[in-house]
Amino acid sequence: MQGLIQKSGYIKSGGGAGGYAEYIATRDGVELLNRSGQYMEYIAERPRSHGLFTNAEYADLEKTMEEVNSHTAPVWTFIYSLRREDAARLGYDSAASWRRLLLAHQAELAEAMKIPPSQFRWYAAFHDEKHHPHIHMMVW
């Protein structure tokens, strides 16, 4: 995708991956995915609401933090960023649109990272920054 900026890194086992998950899920500017009815109201108003999403319908931040903290191999981190005008032009200016993109390409990403698709795990959060909307993604 033209104009896409990628930054990559990793967190070693025992290196605080759960804290990183909490940071990307709860920092200022994170967008909550729309959910229907009373459940959305519950999500938006409950303590520790977050914008974490994954391939499942709901991402549980506490369970995610426990899972990545107990993971014994590196957790890979990615930031994908676009300029505001490119995000608007391409339609990647919401958490839902980024989630659809990641869902469409998760098998390719698993293959590229040499992770069996059945074992591939990922979580992400969309940060709607003024000049560069972006996602933070964790993969293991």
Report each predicted region and the residues it spans:
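N-terminal nicking endonuclease/strand-transfer module with a His-rich metal-binding environment
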Residues: 1-133, 137-140
